[in-house]
UniProtKB/Swiss-Prot annotation:
Main location: cytoplasm
Sequence similarity: Belongs to the acetylglutamate kinase family. ArgB subfamily.
Single GO biological process annotation from the record: L-arginine biosynthetic process
Organism: Bradyrhizobium sp. (strain ORS 278)
Top-level taxon in the UniProt lineage: Bacteria
UniProt cross-references to PANTHER family, sorted A to Z: N-ACETYLGLUTAMATE SYNTHASE, N-ACETYLGLUTAMATE SYNTHASE, MITOCHONDRIAL
Subcellular compartments: Cytoplasm
Reactions that this protein is recorded to catalyse: N-acetyl-L-glutamate + ATP = N-acetyl-L-glutamyl 5-phosphate + ADP
Keywords: Amino-acid biosynthesis, Arginine biosynthesis, ATP-binding, Cytoplasm, Kinase, Nucleotide-binding, Transferase
Signal peptide start and end residues: none
Protein name: Acetylglutamate kinase
Function (record text): Catalyzes the ATP-dependent phosphorylation of N-acetyl-L-glutamate.
Site, as annotated: Transition state stabilizer: K34, K256
EC number: 2.7.2.8
Taxonomic lineage of the native organism: Bacteria, Pseudomonadati, Pseudomonadota, Alphaproteobacteria, Hyphomicrobiales
């Protein structure tokens, strides 16, 4: 994107004027933004993201941020000499690992992002799904085919959960006081056990419960790509399911798109998968005619 210092004052005014209809469209609407990918590890990118979140709040939008932390968790586990195993794209989380995961997600990452947003002039509050019993989870299960026996087996993922219930009491209070919730994807079972939850899945559950206007999933890829590796700007749920069935959508993109479909079916009006490494990706998506990434809708 062109640096603002190289744009004439007239062009800057024109850009702001063209953004006005989009600002009006999202006035007093809730936008859930899942911030993840390797862009989180870059301080300048993280601070730019924080400024964009503050801008949303200043334009009468209600932003709710959910963050991931896979690379940072991996770095900490490696530093401590703990080897991670993965199954079906999810980290197998034992008792020792869940303590580290909670420390990294709810501690260092969450508070750092809260600090960046507050430094930019916002009023962010750092929480996780455990706070106020916001997100209840059940133990996640996955099956995999054994390569030797070719028999499908259930994989024990340990303390990995999937959202089962979202209580909006605390979130609605924060939004009502014009505070910016920043959520780490941790939840508890009804028995009080802490679970690590995939950040996309967590964001989808929160967005669905809030009936958000938009759910934005910031990732390391431009969006959903066709078989020629070109960006698909917009697809319906029906089209998305066809692309999964024919193999166009594959690998790690499948659970992301399934999260999008779930959120839409729960009442979210539109979900966008976009590249978090693109400067001001959130603003480009919400405040420009062309947007960015892939919009999935009903």
């Amino acid at each position: 994107m062109t640096d603002a210092t190289t744009i004439s004052p007239l062009d800057q005014a024109r850009i702001l004027s063209e953004a006005l209809p989009h600002m009006q469209e999202y006035d007093d609407e809730t936008i859930v933004i899942k911030y993840g990918g390797h862009a989180m590890g870059d301080e300048d990118t993280a601070k730019a993201f924080a400024r964009d979140i503050v801008l949303l709040e200043q334009t009468a939008i209600n932003p709710v941020v959910v963050h991931g932390g896979g690379p940072q968790i991996a770095t900490m586990l490696k530093r401590l000499g703990i080897v991670s195993e993965f199954a079906a794209g999810l980290r197998i989380t034992d008792a020792a690992t869940i303590e580290i995961v909670e420390m990294v997600l709810a501690g260092s990452i969450n508070k750092q992002l809260v600090g960046y947003i507050n430094e930019a002039g916002g009023k962010a509050v750092g929480l996780c799904g455990k706070d106020g019993n916001m997100v209840r989870a059940v133990k996640a299960t996955r099956t995999m085919v054994d390569p030797d026996s070719h028999i499908e087996k259930v994989v024990d993922l340990g303390f990995v959960g999937e959202p089962d219930k979202v209580d909006l009491t605390l979130l609605n209070q924060l939004i009502g006081y014009e505070l910016i919730p920043v959520l780490a994807p941790l939840a508890t079972s009804k028995e009080g056990q802490t679970f690590n939850v995939n950040a996309d899945t967590f964001a989808g559950a929160v967005a669905g419960a809030l009936k958000a206007k938009r759910l934005l999933l910031l990732t390391d890829v431009p969006g959903v790509l066709d078989k020629s590796k070109k960006l698909i700007p917009e697809i319906s749920i029906k089209d998305a399911r066809k692309l999964i069935a024919d193999g166009t959508i594959s690998g790690g993109m499948i659970p992301k798109v399934e999260t999008c479909i779930y959120a839409l079916e729960q009442g979210v009006q539109g979900v966008v998968i976009l590249d978090g490494k693109v400067p001001h990706a959130v603003l480009l998506e919400l405040f420009t005619n062309q947007g960015t990434g892939t919009l999935i809708h009903k």
